[in-house]
């Protein structure tokens, strides 16, 4: 696989950068107008950093057995673990970036059932142990780009989605793959309270074209940093599609269904003019409310010292995936 442009040491997110001290915040308030250029959701998340010195404590996941294929040992500089497990979008547990780590401990991941159905010859079901033992696991270092114009680099652990789909034997009628998150309002407060959950319709649903789902980069993810996923990152299994914006990475999946028609997707249903079905990372197609030309790679020194870097087409994976969209107008099909 072609090497992807490495980030520099200056891009690394330092351990001390994630939450600002109260004293730093007081100094920062005098020039906080700079934050107003960020997306509205990001502005709210910056305010959540002001709540105190203590960062949320992520549950410790069990160690996983996995390989580290040479093809995925990228030169990319990793975002530290506490950033990835402490700065999340998972509206089922609240709108602020710190809410999932603070609230997702209520999520019950054992037992778990993942059903594969629809336009397949051999539908089947995976249980909790199957998720980490049915298919060989491997670590892959991927860029992660949020539609809010911030990014991370994460060592995910999982298996290619095509292995799961191939075992189900898709029929000739299968054109798309539909995903669905667990619906458990008692464990996921955002599903019960529209104010907590951002007014979205739950359960969260996502979808891919079948060829996108079968691409070797598309990963069913069960771990991060050598351990099982913590709840706030989508335990026990989530989707990672590294050339797409992060909201395509549906979490805590209970259903994968192959379909003839394009499935509905949560953010597209909520705001179709802002969030398309494809959601490919594209610096030339702005969000209606902010630019996608650059991104914030959270760095040392806190929120006021974050450096911006150019956004890469398909998040740096163009050589692998651009052929999937040959002849497709990416501005119209965003």
Swiss-Prot record:
On assembly, the entry states:
Heterodimer of a catalytic subunit (MsrP) and a heme-binding subunit (MsrQ).
The signal peptide stretch is 1-44
The cellular component terms of Gene Ontology attached to this UniProt record, alphabetical and capped at eight, are:
periplasmic space
What remark does the entry make about the cofactor?
Binds 1 Mo-molybdopterin (Mo-MPT) cofactor per subunit.
Q: Where in the cell is it found?
A: Periplasm
What are the entry keywords? Metal-binding, Molybdenum, Oxidoreductase, Periplasm, Signal
According to UniProt, the reaction catalysed is: L-methionyl-[protein] + a quinone + H2O = L-methionyl-(S)-S-oxide-[protein] + a quinol; L-methionyl-[protein] + a quinone + H2O = L-methionyl-(R)-S-oxide-[protein] + a quinol
Which organism is this entry from?
Answer: Salmonella arizonae (strain ATCC BAA-731 / CDC346-86 / RSK2980)
The protein's role, per its UniProt record: Part of the MsrPQ system that repairs oxidized periplasmic proteins containing methionine sulfoxide residues (Met-O), using respiratory chain electrons. Thus protects these proteins from oxidative-stress damage caused by reactive species of oxygen and chlorine generated by the host defense mechanisms. MsrPQ is essential for the maintenance of envelope integrity under bleach stress, rescuing a wide series of structurally unrelated periplasmic proteins from methionine oxidation, including the primary periplasmic chaperone SurA and the lipoprotein Pal.
The record, for InterPro entries, names: MsrP (IPR022867), OxRdtase_Mopterin-bd_dom (IPR000572), OxRdtase_Mopterin-bd_sf (IPR036374), TAT_signal (IPR006311)
Q: What are the GO BP annotations of this UniProt entry?
A: protein repair
Q: What is its EC number?
A: 1.8.5.-
Record flagged with keyword Oxidoreductase: yes
Summarize the PTM comment: Predicted to be exported by the Tat system. The position of the signal peptide cleavage has not been experimentally proven.
Q: What is the lineage of its organism?
A: Bacteria, Pseudomonadati, Pseudomonadota, Gammaproteobacteria, Enterobacterales
Could you give a GO molecular-function term held by this entry?
A: metal ion binding
Q: Which cofactor does it need?
A: Mo-molybdopterin
Cited Pfam families: Oxidored_molyb (PF00174)
Q: Could you identify this protein by its name?
A: Protein-methionine-sulfoxide reductase catalytic subunit MsrP
